[in-house]
Design a protein with these regions (language model features):
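Carbohydrate-binding/catalytic loop surfaces
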Residues: 508-510
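Bacterial N-terminal signal peptides that target proteins for export
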Residues: 1-10
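Short hydrophobic transmembrane-like helices used for membrane targeting/insertion
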Residues: 7, 17-20
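Formylglycine-dependent sulfatase
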Residues: 12-15, 22-450, 454-457, 465-485, ...
Length: 524
């Protein structure tokens, strides 16, 4: 059942962009089809176009060479928070999705809801990870705005087990990225026959551990340097789902094979769109969901890893291909983040945006080549929740509705299914403002407690992308100003966490050019 929302602003907007009469149908067709693609644990360096010495990604390289390459694109430091971020345009702490395994809240209005209201067909394929995908879940893809879905509660490898529209889990045989793309292409073909614009979200299970690959992809990386045999990493066993230690070289061979298979699948999708005559006015947006995990990390120009707010934890590949809207290739160094996807996509689709605090901005000026800097800083906050307080906290969703059904290849708490949780937060306390946090401007990045005991760090990423030179003591006035901005924003996030954004009927706000023409976030 779809959420009850005030749709009058959306209808008004559609009248504005779709003239009445014969021209209306033509104008309606101008709106692009939209496909969001996301790799799982795919870091910024792990693509050919960013100069990786080993990873082969010819199709992502083609997208970067023909479309808009986002060199400073960011995500949350871990998985579920980024997925919630994409769906809502809001920081995940606003609705309690602090870490992997925390569900989204049913009241959240998603980009799928908004585009469905605007006349788009909506489909989800692959990893969900913001709640169970079963029919009874109030946060399954259908409840969060998708008309059709073939999804998994968490992550998967070869021969994945997926649920179609909340039905019993079904095993598919083959490389998981290829399976998702084949299913998505079938979906797109049906929508073309129905003459419906489509919004399709494809969230791959690759290259998340435990790693695996088909033989032809594994053979591509047999020449990796032997020096990686001297390093041992801890990760999940494909056979048992338990933690094991393995040589880094063996792990990288499998990890890179997964990336190449995912890339090849993206190439198959691009070719299918061309065959169907849809490629010109279909926007493809690829990104990773967080940075490189320790189990997949070799030498790097960046500091940190998945789960941290240093560059290797949050900086990810970002590329947009849309021939009709981005006819010439461009490279952008403007800071952008996954929360920008919702306001941007809504503007593209002529859809409304929810009348709640958003953390993303509309990037249409960037797509149009009219945005050279980001006025609104990007804020990060990795708060893991108060484990002690949650023992007595009231669950936000009944626990029986939060149990997963799609089998994992990795044990979570001794179980081979993913169960979710979310809690009511009745009051704001001083101890709620802890955790790693950061604020990124065009000039500086302030990091607080990025690692235990590190305190306050200030970096000039243009001169020091590796975050090695802490400028905090040299610029106390900048530290003070950015710290205040970050703390003030945290207060607003905590208000959201307490449920103060929700009303009985979540209203929508029209996205108009006046709201977004300068690339600034506007107050509601």
């Amino acid at each position: 059942m779809k959420k009850t929302r005030c749709i009058f602003p959306a209808l008004t907007l559609l009248f504005l962009v779709c003239p009445v009469g014969a021209e209306a149908a033509d104008e309606e067709q101008v709106r692009p089809n939209i496909i969001l693609l996301m790799g799982d644990d795919h870091g910024w360096e792990e693509v050919g176009y960013n100069g990786h010495p080993y990873v082969k990604t010819p199709y992502l390289d083609e997208m970067a060479a023909s479309g808009l390459r986002l060199d400073n694109f960011y995500a949350q430091p871990v998985c579920s928070p980024t997925r919630g971020n994409v769906l809502t345009g809001r920081h995940p702490n606003r609705y309690g999705t602090f870490t992997p395994g925390r569900s989204i809240r049913p009241e959240e209005v998603t980009v799928a809801h908004l585009l469905s209201d605007a006349g788009y067909a909506t489909g989800h394929f692959g990893k969900w990870h913001v709640g169970p995908v079963k029919k009874t879940s109030p946060t399954n893809p259908g409840a969060m705005g998708f008309d059709e879905w073939l999804s998994h509660d968490n992550f998967f490898e070869l021969d994945p087990v997926l649920s179609r529209n909340g039905g019993p889990p079904q095993k598919f045989y083959g490389e998981s990225s290829e399976i998702l793309i084949d299913e998505a292409i079938n979906y797109i073909e049906k929508k073309k026959q129905a003459d419906a614009p489509f919004f399709t979200v494809i969230w791959f299970g690759s290259p998340h551990e435990p790693y695996s690959g088909i033989e032809t992809d594994l053979l591509l990386y047999q020449d990796l340097p032997e020096k990686y045999n001297d390093v041992t990493v801890r990760l999940t066993s494909n056979e048992t789902g338990e933690k094991v230690k393995r040589p880094l070289r063996d792990v990288l061979i499998e990890r890179y094979a997964e990336i190449t298979a995912m890339d090849r699948s993206i190439g198959k999708l691009r070719n299918a769109l061309k065959t169907l005559g849809l490629s010109d006015n279909t926007l493809l947006w690829y990104c990773g969901d967080n940075g490189i995990p320790p189990s997949g990390l070799r030498e790097s120009r960046f500091r940190g890893y998945k789960g941290q707010l240093y560059e290797n934890g949050i900086r990810v590949p970002g590329v947009i291909e849309w021939p009709a809207g981005i006819p010439e290739p461009r490279v952008s160094s403007v800071n952008a983040i996954t929360s920008d996807i919702l306001p941007t996509v809504c503007q593209l689709a002529g859809a409304a945006t929810p009348d709640v605090p958003l953390d993303g901005i509309n990037l249409m000026p960037l797509l149009n080549g009219k945005m050279n800097e980001r006025v609104e800083p990007i804020k990060f906050w990795y708060f893991r929740g108060d484990q002690k307080a949650e023992k007595s906290a009231k669950p936000y969703i009944a626990p029986e509705l939060q149990t997963g059904t799609t089998p994992l290849v990795k044990k979570m708490g001794g179980l081979l299914t993913r169960n979710f949780k979310n809690f009511h937060h009745p009051e704001i306390r001083e101890q709620d403002f802890v955790g790693a946090r950061a604020i990124l401007t065009d000039d500086y990045k302030l990091v607080i407690e990025g690692e235990k005991g590190m305190g306050v760090e200030l970096f000039d990423l243009k001169k020091d992308p590796g975050e090695q030179n802490n400028l905090a003591s040299a610029h106390p006035e900048i530290v003070k100003r950015l710290s205040k901005q970050l703390r003030d924003w945290q207060g607003g996030v905590m208000n959201s966490l307490m449920g103060r954004d929700y009303t009985s009927s979540t209203s929508l706000k029209s996205a108009t050019e006046s709201d977004v023409s300068d690339g600034k976030a506007k107050p509601f």
